[in-house]
Amino acid sequence: MAHPRNSRRYQDFDMDNTAQLADAVNAAIAVGKTIVPKGGGSKSHYRVELAESVTIDTSNHEGIVHYHPDELVVRVRAGTKISTLNAVLAESGQYLPAEPPDYDGLATIGGAIASGLSGSGRPYWGGLKDYVLGIKLILPSGEVANFGGDVMKNVAGYDLSRLQVGAMGSLGLILDIALKILPKPLLVKYFKVHCRREDVVSMLANFGQMPGLTGLKYFDSQILVRLSGSAEAVAQAEHLLPVERAPANITDFQKGAIDQLQPSQQLWRWDGQPAAPLEQPGLVAMDWGGALRWLDADSSQLKSVDSSQMTFVKTGSLPRPHLQTRQDGVGRLQNRIKAALDPEGHFIDYPALRLYS
């Protein structure tokens, strides 16, 4: 059953602050302050503080604008907690397959869109951008605009909605997002298998061919496997696992995720081929079947690693390293898009997160 926008189930967190946020953006533009969007603050470690800037907080701009379970579409305000959205969807047996990290309940859906982070199901279900249907935001001109829509099949043209995914708040202030959602799998089971470090790449490659696989990780000398589907399909896939497998649960599976890791030195993200050798120093966890790796290392230890594959996340006991923006083709494209959509530089630039020698 579709639930209307103002039904009682949503009233306790239904806050529309569009007018106030638009006023705040236009006031900052008028005095020449750089605008820094903020949601739950769970990803503030990506940025450094800027002089002559103003932070505009969207965390009170929250609630479900509308939710139509039969149509597999939900529109949600940017300040809504991911945990809240997940709970609402679960009541109808649905979920957001991109699984953006919720940082122990702090993360908002607007921050998830801005960061573009997706969970362990990324290789199997797609990333967050694949589930964005439409976005309402405040442009660098100060205008409120809508892009995309609330239907699966959208009009042709350049998709400014998905362009916001991973833009880190550099292209405008997100107000609300229309998302495609899916029914939850009939059955989900988790398993863990002990693995020596020297065997992890080959074991991940072997497990990666399994049917029903929706998550494949490595953490704390264990390979963590998630299988999803019908009871029959999951049972068949389970028999392909080694006999020494042990049952696990969702808490076990979530260990080693970006929102759970606390580095002693500096936390870095490595993206590459799953079969790449374990030559990166400070490896603490792997995801996406080995294509995503988390390193706890000093930047001085990473000189031998291809810098185009490394992204800074946050620091532990060490100071923040000297970082640069992307210098490759993607970086140049980011700069061109920023110049086209925010020529006056009213919103913050994409953060410098790359380490170049």
Cite the ranges covered by each PLM segment.
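Basic, alpha-helical nucleic-acid-binding regions used in initiation and control of genome expression
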Residues: 45
